[in-house]
C-alpha cells in the first residue's frame, strides 16, 4: 500500500515499497536503492514517514541520514504515534516538506490501513456472483458457474493479496470449496491467506476439501457454544484450530 520514489536531476534513482508488516518500510527500501544519489534528492512517498520505534526504526531518521533535501507526501499517517509527527520531524531537520499531492488516490490506496487505525476493524471486501435478475443460484441450488473465467481469475488474484477469506457453512457444504489463491498464470501468491468458516453447529465434514487441506493451507472454523462437543473435538483434531 505504501510506495516511495527518490528522484534527482529529473530521473528516478531509487524505488521501494512496504512488502508486509514488520519488514522495511518503503522509504528505507527506496533510500537503499538510491544509495549516495539520495543526498540532495527529493523523496516522494504515498504515506507520511513514521517517526516512532515499532517493528522498524523511524523512517524520518533514515531520511535525514540519507541527506534528502525535499519530501513530497501524498497523505498523512492516521496512526496516533505519527499523525503529523513525521512531517514535523522532517521540517525540524531542515527538510522541505510538501503534503497533499495525489491525496485522494493515496487515501483510496491506503484504505485498508486507515480502516484498521480509525475504525478499529479489518478492511472487508464483499464478493458474490449474481445473475442479471438478482439470483445467486438456480431453483435447484446450482450456482456453477454464474461468474466468468475472467472474474474468477480476478478473485484468485485478490485472494493472494488478503489475509483471510470468510464463508458460511452453507457455502462450505454446497460448494466444497478450497478457498485458496490459485492465480491462472501459476505465479506464487504474495501471502498465504487464512480460510475461515462460520459454522455454529460444527457441521463441516472431516472429508471436505477444506479440512483435508488444512495441513497445507491454514483453516479456522468458528463454532458456537451450541455445537456438539464431539463435533468440536473432531474438527480440532483434524485441523488444530476449531474456535468457539
Model segments located where?
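Structural motif corresponding to alpha-helix initiation and N-cap regions
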Residues: 24, 56-57, 84, 103, ...
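Zn2+-dependent cytidine deaminase-like catalytic core
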Residues: 6-105, 194, 220, 225
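Active-site ligand-binding patch in enzyme domains
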Residues: 115, 123-128, 132, 136-241
Amino acid at each position: 500500500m505504501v510506495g516511495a520514489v527518490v528522484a534527482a536531476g529529473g530521473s528516478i534513482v531509487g524505488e521501494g515499497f512496504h512488502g508486509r508488516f514488520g519488514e522495511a518500510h518503503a522509504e528505507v527500501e527506496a533510500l537503499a536503492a538510491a544509495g549516495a544519489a539520495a543526498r540532495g534528492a527529493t523523496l516522494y512517498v504515498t504515506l507520511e514517514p513514521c517517526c516512532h520505534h515499532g517493528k522498524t526504526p523511524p523512517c524520518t531518521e533514515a531520511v535525514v541520514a540519507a541527506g534528502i533535501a525535499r519530501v513530497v507526501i501524498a497523505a498523512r499517517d492516521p496512526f496516533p504515534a505519527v499523525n503529523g509527527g513525521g512531517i514535523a520531524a522532517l521540517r525540524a531537520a531542515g527538510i522541505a516538506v510538501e503534503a497533499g499531492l495525489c491525496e485522494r488516490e493515496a487515501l483510496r490506496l491506503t484504505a485498508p490501513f486507515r480502516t484498521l487505525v480509525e475504525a478499529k476493524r479489518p478492511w472487508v471486501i464483499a464478493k458474490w456472483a449474481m445473475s442479471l435478475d438478482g439470483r445467486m443460484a438456480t431453483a435447484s441450488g446450482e450456482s456453477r458457474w454464474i461468474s466468468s473465467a475472467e472474474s474468477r481469475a480476478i478473485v484468485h488474484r485478490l485472494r493472494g493479496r488478503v489475509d483471510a477469506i470468510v464463508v458460511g457453512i452453507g457455502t462450505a457444504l454446497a460448494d466444497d470449496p478450497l478457498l485458496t489463491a490459485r492465480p491462472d498464470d501459476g505465479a506464487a501468491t504474495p501471502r498465504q491467506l487464512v480460510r475461515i468458516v462460520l459454522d455454529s453447529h460444527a457441521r463441516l465434514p472431516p472429508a471436505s476439501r477444506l479440512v483435508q487441506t488444512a495441513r497445507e493451507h491454514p483453516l479456522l472454523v468458528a463454532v458456537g457454544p451450541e455445537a456438539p462437543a464431539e463435533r468440536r473435538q473432531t474438527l480440532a483434531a483434524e485441523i488444530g484450530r476449531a474456535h468457539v
